[in-house]
């Protein structure tokens, strides 16, 4: 039994220290596939997940969102190692790739 407690303690501490290194940031910059590709190229970015934010329609389709009828925006969730890349660097990547004065088409849209 004491070995199980020791193993549990080691695994629990390892898991906490690993997850403490990771952070999440969300960006909406038009076509999420273009935004996704831009962030995936950065060292320290672990994963980029596309999805939707806001809106009035529950579980909208891509077609519904792109027609502009749902109020949703295409967004990406960026999971990154904050010991390798800073949030500021992620923001710089975002601002370099969008036009903040264009509300309807960003990146390669």
What are these regions (language model features)?
Residues 3-13:
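Sec-dependent N-terminal signal peptides
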Residues 16-109:
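Flexible coil/turn and secondary-structure edge motifs
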Residues 2-3, 19:
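Bacterial Sec-exported substrate-binding components of ABC uptake systems
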